[in-house]
């Protein structure tokens, strides 16, 4: 799990080098994962566990939006989570 989210952080930092306003922090990636999970009506057990873990983190309210490539990487991670 950490490896896929690290990949999203690398994509975000590349976007920052190209002019995006957000450097990228782990809470940004976690907040994006939680936002994606909120769109699902039916979650598998792994997705349910991740959603519960992320909902407990109060610091996610300070997260900033990710670049599109990083959002796509997080979305791919969440959808393929088993």
From Swiss-Prot:
<dbReference type="GO" id="GO:0140678">
    <property type="term" value="F:molecular function inhibitor activity"/>
</dbReference>
<protein>
    <recommendedName>
        <fullName>Lysis inhibition accessory protein</fullName>
    </recommendedName>
</protein>
<comment type="subunit">
    <text>Homooligomer. Interacts with holin (via N-terminus).</text>
</comment>
<dbReference type="GO" id="GO:0140313">
    <property type="term" value="F:molecular sequestering activity"/>
</dbReference>
<comment type="function">
    <text>Probably binds to the cytoplasmic part of the holin during lysis inhibition and stabilizes the holin-antiholin complex thereby resulting in a robust block of the hole formation.</text>
</comment>
<feature type="site" description="Interaction with holin">
    <location>
        <position position="42"/>
    </location>
</feature>
<comment type="similarity">
    <text>Belongs to the T4likevirus lysis inhibition accessory protein rIII family.</text>
</comment>
<dbReference type="InterPro" id="IPR034688">
    <property type="entry name" value="Linr3"/>
</dbReference>
